[in-house]
């Protein structure tokens, strides 16, 4: 068996809320229960696999949109569920962990949207990023761009005073595509289409004379962030092309994590954070 296969079984056994335990002992149990090794065989194999599995957990904590496990003690190689409530957590981290327990129902509700609603969802996410002016383009004539928005940096109080004064008149543009493909991965050709559409928009080249992008006010040297949202996932080729071309590509799971961390659609029920479809829909339709 490969370390990745063992990690997958560990994630299922421990779960996102599982308490701390020794990694090697957890691997031993998985090897016996899921791979039918005898106790002595499992003990020897766990010793060989421990470092590799630990490295995979650390890597997923850094790169995965929604890691399942976390390393809680490097000295003894202890592991726990990623959302396990640690007494040392700050109030912000504790709240984020409670919200992340609702990622699955939140993702399912995102996938339940119609393709028109998912384009509106793209514009709504821009508002969560701070954009004040957002718009969804007409579906029949979107010129390869489904949604866009403008963020005025001078309106954001998080900027330090010197930079805030310098950036007062800077307006950051966002433009993107939203593809409702829950089961079909996004390939590099779709990333290429978005890059081409934005390149044409920069030069004011469109297939019609409609002025649907006038609100974007895109000039040759305006800063613009290209975004691609999907309810599903991306192929490795699409992610590679997005990284090389500067496109921010977000899968359905990554979008669900982003919204869960902002408590979208969440409410507190006697200390338990729960997801509510109506609250999510209210958020989607709010201006």
Model regions: which residues?
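Mixed-charge (Asp/Glu-Lys/Arg
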Residues: 1-287
């Amino acid at each position: 068996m490969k370390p990745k296969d063992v990690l997958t079984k560990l994630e299922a056994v421990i779960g996102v809320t599982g308490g701390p335990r020794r990694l090697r002992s957890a691997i031993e149990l998985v090897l016996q229960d899921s791979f039918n090794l005898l106790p002595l065989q499992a003990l020897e194999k766990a010793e060989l696999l421990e470092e590799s599995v630990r490295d995979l957990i650390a890597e997923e904590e850094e790169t995965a949109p929604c890691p399942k496990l976390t390393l809680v003690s490097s000295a003894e190689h202890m592991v726990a569920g990623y959302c396990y409530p640690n007494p040392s957590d700050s109030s912000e981290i504790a709240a984020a962990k409670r919200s992340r327990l609702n990622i699955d129902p939140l993702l399912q509700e995102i996938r339940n949207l119609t393709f028109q609603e998912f384009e509106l969802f793209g514009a709504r996410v821009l508002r969560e990023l701070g954009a004040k002016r957002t718009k969804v383009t007409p579906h029949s004539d979107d010129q390869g761009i489904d949604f866009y928005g403008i963020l005025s940096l001078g309106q954001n109080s998080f900027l330090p005073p010197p930079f805030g004064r310098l950036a007062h008149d800077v307006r950051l543009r966002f433009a993107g595509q939203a593809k409702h493909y829950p089961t079909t991965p996004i390939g590099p050709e779709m990333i290429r289409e978005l890059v081409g559409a934005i390149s044409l928009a920069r030069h004011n080249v469109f297939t019609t004379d409609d002025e649907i992008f006038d609100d974007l006010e895109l000039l040759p040297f305006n800063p613009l962030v290209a975004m691609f949202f999907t309810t599903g996932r991306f192929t490795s080729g699409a992610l590679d092309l997005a990284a090389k071309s500067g496109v921010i590509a977000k899968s359905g799971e990554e979008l669900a994590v982003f919204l869960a961390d902002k408590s979208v659609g969440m409410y507190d029920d006697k200390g338990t954070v729960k997801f509510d479809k109506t609250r999510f829909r209210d958020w989607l339709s709010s201006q």
